[in-house]
């Protein structure tokens, strides 16, 4: 029970930081207001914001963002550890990369972070025996982010 609460606190702390940064950046760069609203401020949770980013980046003519988002949310709902790992990854980027000063930067801009989070979803699907969709996602990830 204590471990679950600690994980939830990590995710919530990261999410609170991201939302505060987005509000601040909206005042600094009003032209990006819609971007920050759609990407962060209109999302209820870190999982929703990450799912939004991944689905919109990986969307294709044969796999629209809305379908991908449902799939990603399904994984996040079944295994909250995937979201905790993403929050820890994000925090590690901020702590270890001197070029990254905002918690929102990896979520919004860094393809390496987004690729890893996408692969976490694909890996979960593979473990669940959903090999074809995992292969399909791997292909989308490779094409979109340029990583294998």
Label every PLM stretch briefly:
Residues 138, 147-148:
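A short, contiguous structural element within a folded domain that forms the immediate neighborhood
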Residues 1-140:
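Terminal amphipathic alpha-helical/low-complexity segments used for targeting or macromolecular assembly
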Residues 143-145:
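Left-handed beta-helix
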């Amino acid at each position: 029970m204590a471990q679950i609460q600690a994980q939830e606190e990590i995710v919530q702390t990261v999410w609170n930081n991201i939302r505060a940064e987005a509000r601040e950046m909206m005042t600094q760069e009003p032209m990006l207001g819609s971007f920050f609203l759609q990407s962060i401020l209109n999302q209820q949770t870190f999982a929703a914001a990450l799912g939004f980013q991944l689905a919109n980046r990986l969307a294709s003519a044969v796999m629209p963002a809305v379908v991908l988002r449902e799939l990603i949310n399904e994984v996040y709902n079944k295994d909250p550890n995937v979201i905790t790992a993403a929050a820890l990854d994000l925090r590690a980027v901020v702590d270890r990369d001197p070029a990254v000063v905002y918690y929102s930067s990896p979520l919004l801009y860094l393809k390496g972070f987004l690729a890893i989070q996408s692969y976490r979803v694909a890996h979960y699907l593979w473990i669940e025996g959903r090999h074809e969709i995992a292969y399909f996602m791997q292909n989308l990830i490779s094409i979109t982010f340029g990583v294998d």
